[in-house]
Swiss-Prot record:
Residues 23-32 have a biased composition (Polar residues). Pfam families: Hormone_2. Promotes hydrolysis of glycogen and lipids, and raises the blood sugar level. GO terms for molecular function: glucagon receptor binding; hormone activity. Belongs to the glucagon family. It is found in: Secreted. InterPro entries: Glucagon, Glucagon_GIP_secretin_VIP. Residues 1-20 form the signal peptide. This is Glucagon-1. It comes from Xenopus laevis.
Length: 266
């Protein structure tokens, strides 16, 4: 009996060992399977990351994260600055600068200030009415050309007077006909008149322009029209031609006897 019990115990021990030995193997197998699965998951995650980088989705997600973070920071900044009331004023200033109303208001303010200062200057000690009227008259005369016409008329009248005085006082009595035929007499007369007119104009500028009343002769509009048409210069030329013709006839009459004496002597 003892041997039988001993044999049964040995068999039970063997059976127990056979049942207990596969258990560790299954645990190891399960662990290896889990490790393999984890490695496979890690590999798949890495493949997904690589794929996301290649497709740009990872960068997009990162950009979205940064945008959301900036939005949160901006909202927080708005909440902080809104309490102080500076946001509304700054936005209003920015809108005014963008629309140009700020610059317009500054310009309007400067214009109003300049107008006020100008009015104060006129009230306190501005230029007198006589100075303003004289300046306006001078500007109008320069713009219309009457000032230049007066200078031209003065020079022409002065030249005519000097030419008449020269003919009366200093007319040469022994002049050859050849000078009139060659034109040298006319050239000398022109040079003399130009020199005399230049001298008189310089003296007129130094001493001061004489005052003349044009209402007795012609109106300003008529004088401008005559200068523009050239009729005034034509009248002066006619007067000079008539005077020259008269003087030439007198010269011919006075020198006729002298020429006859010369011919008889020859």
């Amino acid at each position: 009996m003892k041997s039988t019990c001993y044999m049964i115990g040995i068999l039970l021990m063997i059976l127990q060992n056979t049942y207990q030995s596969p258990v560790p193997e299954t645990d190891a197998n399960s662990r290896s399977v889990k490790a393999a699965r984890n490695e496979a998951v890690d590999d798949s995650e890495q493949l997904k990351e690589v794929k996301r980088h290649s497709q740009g989705t990872f960068t997009s997600d990162y950009s979205k994260y940064l945008d959301s973070r900036r939005a949160q920071d901006f909202v927080q900044w708005l909440m902080n600055t809104k309490r102080s009331g500076e946001l509304s004023r700054r936005n209003a200033d920015y809108e005014r600068h963008a629309e140009g109303t700020f610059t317009s208001d500054v310009t309007q303010q400067l214009d109003e200030k300049a107008a006020k200062e100008f009015i104060d200057w006129l009230i306190n000690g501005g230029p007198s009415k006589e100075i303003i009227s004289r300046r306006n008259a001078e500007f109008e005369r320069h713009a219309e050309g009457t000032y230049t016409n007066d200078v031209t008329e003065y020079l022409e009248e002065k030249a005519a007077k000097e030419f008449i005085e020269w003919l009366i006082k200093g007319k040469p009595k022994k002049i050859r006909y050849s000078r009139h035929a060659e034109g040298t007499f006319t050239n000398d007369m022109t040079n003399y008149l130009e020199e005399k007119a230049a001298k008189e104009f310089v003296g007129w500028l130094i001493k001061g322009r004489p005052k003349r009343n044009f209402s007795e002769v012609h109106s300003v509009e008529e004088m401008d029209r005559r200068h523009a048409d050239g009729s005034f210069t034509n009248d002066i030329n006619k007067v000079l031609d008539i005077i020259a013709a008269q003087e030439f006839l007198d010269w011919v009459i006075n020198t006729q006897e002298t020429e006859r004496d010369l011919l008889e002597e020859q």
